[in-house]
Design a protein with these regions (language model features):
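Structure-specific nucleic-acid interaction/processing domains
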Residues: 1-17, 21-106
Length: 106
């Protein structure tokens, strides 16, 4: 599975969008200071994510978020996203996905 995610900086609320296969490891990497583009605004927390079966679909969605969605639109999406889904996922170590969670498969 592939994840498209939006991180929120706890320093100033800046948003960062990316995609990965391991969302837990990627969040830890961002918070470790090893990712140049997020180093200065650490710590980060997971604000939103979507799940895809194919990497190409996740990459397409990531580009869509980056090119077609402005910051305010992303913030509205995060505000409406159910925080419980994120907490369950982070505790699960990717062994299952909470329901109902949309998995995109084309």
């Amino acid at each position: 599975m592939y994840f498209v995610y939006i991180l929120v900086s706890e320093v100033d609320g800046t948003l960062y969008t990316g995609q990965t296969q391991d969302i837990n490891a990627r969040l830890k990497l961002h918070n470790s200071g090893k990712v140049q583009s997020t180093r200065k605004k650490s710590p980060w927390h997971l604000g939103y994510f979507e799940v895809f079966n194919r990497r190409s679909d996740a990459m397409w969605r990531e580009r869509e978020f980056k090119k077609k969605w402005n910051t305010e639109r992303k913030k509205r999406l995060i505000a409406h996203f159910n925080r419980i889904k994120i907490e369950v996922l982070l505790k699960s170590e990717n062994t299952f996905l909470p329901n109902p969670l949309r998995v995109y498969d084309s």
